[in-house]
Amino acid sequence: MSTFGENITIADLERDPYPIYATLREYEPVSWVPSVNCWLVTRAKDVEIVTTKTELFTAQAPDSPVDRSFGGPTLMTMDGKEHLELRRALDAKFRPRIVASYIDELVRPIALEWLDRLLTQESRTAELITEYFEPISVLSLGSILGIGNLTAERLQDWFHGLAMGATNFEGDPAKAAENDRVAADIEFELRPRMQRMQDSPDNSTISSLLNHGCPVGQGRTIDYVLPSIKVI
């Protein structure tokens, strides 16, 4: 007799995953799902155990589309010392107390600008996710990363292309091609910037990931850091 998890399809998850998660939480809180080649853990207490007992559970997922999409191991798929070192490199910008000190000044002007754009549209209608919330999100994060000069349209294109690749469990060639197009554009834009940051560090998050905790002139390589930048 097959389990509920064995009968879950990618199409089911893409259509509406939340009823599926609810069923798993009630009947199969730890379930092997062949369609995505991984275990789904859906109860909060179990999730806490999996994410904190690093001596028992690994974040590495070499057979998932995640590492392929982002171009290598990332913060999400690293364990131990590697993960800790990159996390520490992010602390200067992303500790809750630090975020609280700058988030309003950073986000409010962006939110107001994009609200004004919506209000000047003749139709007075909008798709709020793509035309308001996503631009605010990507532009705010882009500023923190050190790429605040890039347009919302380009950053949204990166976001959607990488997400498409990271969830391409079915190995769809069209999704892989779209991911690769976006990855190439990111490489084209970021690699020269990162080379400059290696020579002349600044206070951006990207620079911190390259240089934090490293001896002068011996920072992390671009190839090592870039996958985690894509995740962020």
Summary of predicted features, one role per range:
Residues E14, H83, D104, A183, ...:
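Generic alpha-helical segment signature
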Residues M1-I129, V138-Q156, H160-R181:
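Active-site substrate-recognition loop segments, prototypically the cytochrome P450 B′-helix/B-C loop
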Residues E134, V138-S143, D180, I186-E187, ...:
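Central I-helix of cytochrome P450 enzymes
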Residues H160-Q218:
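Cytochrome P450 catalytic core segment centered on helix I
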Residues L90, F159-L162, L209, S228-I232:
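Short alpha-helical scaffolding segments that buttress acidic/His motifs in well-ordered protein cores
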Residues R117, R196-M197, V231-I232:
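Hydrophobic side-chain positions on well-ordered alpha-helices
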